[in-house]
A protein has these predicted regions:
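Conserved N-terminal beta1-alpha1 strand-loop-helix module at the mouth
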Residues: 1-72, 77-118, 128-152, 167, ...
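Flexible, gly/ser-rich surface segments that form the specificity/activation loops bordering the active-site cleft
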Residues: 156
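EAL-family c-di-GMP phosphodiesterase catalytic domain
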Residues: 163-164
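Conserved cofactor-binding/catalytic machinery of classical short-chain dehydrogenase/reductase
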Residues: 174
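C-terminal binding/interaction regions
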Residues: 207
């Protein structure tokens, strides 16, 4: 178990939840990303799986601009600002200059991403650590993520997936087992401001969510979670 000094916050995007046409949803998403960055959310995962690689790269560029505009930190404080990760697409993350990639359980292994970095024309400089997060659904997945050099893991679904019948919750006991891994494990899946403390008590280093951040004022969510 590797605990954080404070509850880590991981906002996962889904622009389909916003109202309006595509331009309106895109504007709403970028506004929410800026809001998250302005209150110090640690990580944002751009998870817009319907977009082509080119469309995702363009959106990632706009998202990075929103993050950087909303966090007026000095260059040497880069590690303290919100970090933008791209869902699944290491190639897009590198091309866009994102801070990392979030790997699904059926993606390449974290250590393989390091090989991709070595071969990429867009590889980060020696001073920029490219983050690799890994999805996990069992304790074995979390230990595998540790052995394959992921920076952190996201365990799901702790309390199930809202609106998806037939997706049973993994439960707090399973989360507790996953948190025995020597990397940070964040909790995802049905987590609310009311039950988040149970995840932290089970050993989670932080909370990952879509609706918790998108449907509420992020400043209020961040304050509540970091008070736990």
């Amino acid at each position: 178990m590797l605990m954080a000094d404070r509850c880590l916050l991981y906002y996962i995007t889904d622009r389909s939840q916003f109202r309006g046409d595509e331009p309106a949803r895109r504007r709403a998403l970028l506004a929410k990303i800026a809001e998250a960055a302005s209150v110090g959310v640690d990580y944002i995962q751009l998870r817009e799986k319907d977009l082509s690689a080119r469309e995702l790269e363009m959106l990632a560029g706009d998202a990075l601009a929103a993050v950087r505009k909303s966090t007026p930190l000095r260059t040497e404080d880069r590690e303290l600002r919100t970090r933008l990760l791209i869902n699944s697409r290491t190639d897009v993350a590198l091309a866009a200059g994102a801070d990392g990639v979030h790997l699904r359980s059926d993606d390449i292994a974290p250590h393989e991403v390091r090989h991709v970095l070595e071969a990429s024309a867009h590889r980060p400089s020696a001073t920029d650590h490219f983050l690799v997060a890994a999805s996990c659904h069992t304790a074995a997945d979390a230990f595998r993520a540790e052995s394959e050099k992921a920076d952190f893991a996201v365990f799901a679904p702790v309390f199930g997936k809202r609106g998806l019948a037939g997706t049973p919750p993994a439960g707090l006991a399973a989360l507790r087992e996953a948190c025995r891994a020597k990397i940070r494990v964040l909790a995802l899946g049905g987590v609310t401001a009311e039950n988040a403390s149970l995840c932290l008590e089970a050993g989670a280093a932080g909370i990952a969510a879509i609706r918790l951040f998108q449907e509420n004022k992020i400043e209020d969510v961040a304050r509540a979670l970091r008070a736990l």
